[in-house]
Amino acid sequence: TAGDANIKINTAIGSITLPGNMLPEELTGAKTVSMSIALADKSKLSQELQQRIGDRPVIELNLKVDGKSYSWSNDDVPVTVAIPYTPTEEELRSPEHITVWYIDSKGNIIEVPSGRYDPETSSVIFSITHFSQFAVVYVTKAFDDLDTVPWDRKAIEVLASKGIIRGKTETEYAPQTDISRAEFLYSLVRALGVTAS
């Protein structure tokens, strides 16, 4: 059916795979639907955010319906984005720390847990359920108390870097501490990319 078909848009800035059912039924009668992917103006970001992102790309995704901006969001229909990216030598030593941030309208950052570097396509790939600004970032989170679990150190730090799990503080993970059901559910929801709806 038409809802099962995907549309892939390729540009020099990136590619987007759009599910055929991404738009709500109320837009069925629209005459034109246009989508844009563009490099965002980093100078509009805070100095701190500009420093944290560095030379990495920041993209902006927009949708217009019949020439008017449309705020698309659909938790049930993720869109896949791929941004061409060449990691630095440091990043190539730990490419699992290459990830993506969603930058909201107030300049706040929200981790996109699905963000990852794909060496086969030399791109950063991630799935989203709304359009906005997204930045490729390299995040390393380290905890000072992981010596008792050396076999888990890398996994814990990568998951924390992607926002899937959280430490007790910025430098303490507390690996021997029991987790609550709520903490487990938070991590599971973030890892799977599911929503409450």
Locate each region found by the language model.
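Proteolytic processing hotspots in large secreted/extracellular or virion-associated proteins
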Residues: 1-106
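Secondary-structure transition/turn motif
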Residues: 12-13, 115, 127-132
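Short domain-boundary/entry signatures in modular proteins, especially
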Residues: 56-57, 136-144
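Generic recognition of long tandem-repeat/solenoid scaffolds
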Residues: 61, 67-72, 121-129, 173
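Glycine-rich adenosyl-nucleotide cofactor-binding module
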Residues: 118-122, 151-154
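C-terminal beta-strand-rich structural cap/linker in extracellular carbohydrate-active enzymes
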Residues: 124-140
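Extracytoplasmic Gram-positive cell-surface binding/anchoring modules and repeats
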Residues: 140-195
